[in-house]
Amino acid sequence: MNRQLFLPLGSEIEKSNLETVFFTFLLSQSIIFLMSEGGSTVLSKTQNQALYELQKELWGYAEPGFLEHKSAKAMSGFLRREGFQVTEGLCGMDTAFVGVWGSGRPVICLLAEFDALYGLSQEADVAEYKPIEGMATGHGCGHHLLGVGSIAAAMIVKDYLEKNKLPGTIKMVGCPAEESGSGKAYLARDGFFADADAAITWHPSALNVVSSGSHQSCIQCYFRFHGVSSHAAGNPEAGRSALDAAELMSVGVNYLREHMDSKERVHYAYTNAGGISPNVVQAEAEVKYLVRSTTNPKCQKLYERVINIAKGAALMTGTTCDVVFDEGLSNVIPNFTLEQVLEEAFFEVGAPEYTEAERAYAKQFRDTYPLDPESEVTAVIAEPKTLIANIQNSDICDIVLRHRCVDECSMGSTDVGDVSWVVPTAQINTACYLSLIHI
């Protein structure tokens, strides 16, 4: 990890860095304001209502990665109306955009995600599973809130800088395809963050707490096996089964698991099993693999081992194999200084105060969800277990929790990691889920 990014709070920091820290402090407050009842007290009632309607609009669109055309148009149009200079089609991605306001330093990038997932269609405000007819996608982890919350933060910072006649540039970055596609990796690759002093993001969660530590590096690819078709009963000796090769590859990878690091993961899914006729030797088969490890070099080494297994499977079956790279994500480099600044802001603003009606609304959803008494609490939380237990037994988290700066790797991946390799980056989580979910 690049330890130069970990600026100690007690050290001598040049003026521009102090401005960056202050600006970050303000920006983090802005995000949290949106979570209070009725929206932000800084924004007008009209603005708050418009933001509320925008998140409903994004929920309704629920567009998957790189296809978020309606969502991106709605968000970029909103930014234009609020006085931001908007540029669309960043780094060859149709649905990537940035809204810029201000001038001079510091330059802070606020990251916004807005893509949805397949298989998660759901009507809004319904506590039971009820997919929308004719719709396959839905927002599974609150990206409709994520994007709109980031816009609200940018608006509040703009208002503050205008009223106080202060220098500084805010960039509200619309980042497509976080769930699958790694939109931020393309932005980082093409130097989009070259002039940025810091990047801040947030994510809906079960808790109000600053995020710390790393996330896994990962590589996603397709293994396409090509064989020879024949009649499986009358002429089996002439066939070379691509499906056999895919299955043997999976067997080999499963034997590999014993000889991997305990924090490494390999997942797979059959995307083409060769057809639906068992009496025909399958000439084509495809498997999608996702390889994860704690750092980029370790992930690359594990990926190469998986490739060798695929080659062996092809050799055993007399088939050939094409390896088609799909996407890759870097591990997250945490920035402990920004984390501490974010936490100071979090505690100054405090958690939202929920009304009884809001708590009753949350309870409707909790009553449909089985309580898991074995649910583990992430190591990033620096609070007594008794306090965490009380939160898990409530409907929604209504306090801010102290976090622990940890140099550990969480299980999971995000393209925020690619941003963290090129600019100091930090993240907060705010309670938008039930307390017992995904802690």
Question: Which residues are covered by each model-predicted region?
Answer:
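Polybasic, lysine-rich low-complexity intrinsically disordered segments
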Residues: 2, 13-16, 20
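Acidic/histidine-rich
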Residues: 355-356, 360-433
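Conserved small/polar residues in nucleotide/adenosyl-binding loops
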Residues: 437-439
